[in-house]
Amino acid sequence: SSDLLQLGDLGSCLVLAAELVDTANANAASLCDPRDEAEERTIRAAYGDGGRGKGLAMNERRLKSALKDMADRHKRRRRRVVLDELDRAVVDLMGFYRDVMVVQLGAQSELVNDEMRPQIERVAAGGRPQETLLRVDALERTRHLLSSNVAPLLAMESLVVTLKDPSLA
């Protein structure tokens, strides 16, 4: 959220959106790569990859098919991890803007992110509840987009631009 407070122009919005997606992709790689590599080794061993003999030609075709199926599974799993990472970031932002709304309305409710009270109060003082509602709507819309197979970068770019300037929603 602190990066969101520093957004100055459209370019900085697009850079932040790309950084969010890049971070999600890097996290997905660190989670998925070891598992993917282990699965590939297992499949190759099961089909006798690297072996010699007449019977291995048929196995080679089966191996190629199994590796293609495995690559498709890996791609789906990696995408799911990326989307889950981005969704968690969006949910965290929803909590932040919920707290902003609590402060703006003077509600007698505890803040979810009390450790961020100074930033929350600064954002609350710099805007109106109507703008905060537009931001929350943008966050909900982004969650929907992420679950609807929209390109993650496009969804995050739209979100960050709207968080910077809710009138663009």
Region locations from a protein language model:
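C-terminal target-recognition/interaction regions appended to catalytic cores
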Residues: 132-136
